[in-house]
Amino acid sequence: GISDTRKSDIARGFGIASGTYENASRLQRFMGNTMLQKFEFRESQDHDLTLLDLGCGTGWFTRKFADFGQIESLSGVDLSPGMLEQARKNGPAGISWIVGDAEHLPLPDSSVDVIFSNLMIQWCDDPGAVLRECRRILRPGGNLMVSTLLDGTLRELKSAWQAADPGHQHVNRFETDLAL
């Protein structure tokens, strides 16, 4: 598994990038906006929703959800304190920003109606553990919206790095769709 040291390195790396991340995250925006277009509130919803942005980074999409009606509680969880500090600066008030590991979420059972997770799960050592945690915190009938990268994504970049620096890995390995 990914060691705590590796997770700390990932969190620190994203923290360092937090100030410029939103300007450089075109793929994340494209994927997240595609997911948002599919997001619908149920007409029969009998209560306002509790929504979690898992792997929220600087809170770009968390802020978009803040503009929706019918959301009683909005939270963003990220491994990187630096990303969450940027999210707090970006506002608005009223969003709970939580430092947490997606494989061990610091949230109670059956406490969330909707989990939105955009291009985060590929950074996790055990995607199955993340999905089990999502199932644990989702209320019955809750919705999980996840986007990720699969094996074969970024193959051109991987090929270019292989030619430039043979024998060294510069592009993350991604799960196959069967593994998920």
Name each model-derived stretch.
Residues 103-115:
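A short acidic, Gly/Pro-enriched loop at the edge of an enzyme's catalytic core
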Residues 26-47, 64:
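Conserved alpha-helix/loop element of class I SAM-dependent methyltransferases that forms part
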Residues 143-175:
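Conserved class I S-adenosyl-L-methionine
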Residues 113-126:
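A short SAM/SAH-binding and catalytic strip from SAM-dependent methyltransferases
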Residues 50-105:
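Class I SAM-dependent methyltransferase SAM/SAH-binding core
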Residues 128-143:
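A short glycine-rich, Lys/Arg-flanked "PGG" loop and its adjoining helix->strand segment in the class I
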Residues 1-19:
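N-terminal, positively charged/glycine-rich alpha-helical extensions of SAM-dependent methyltransferases
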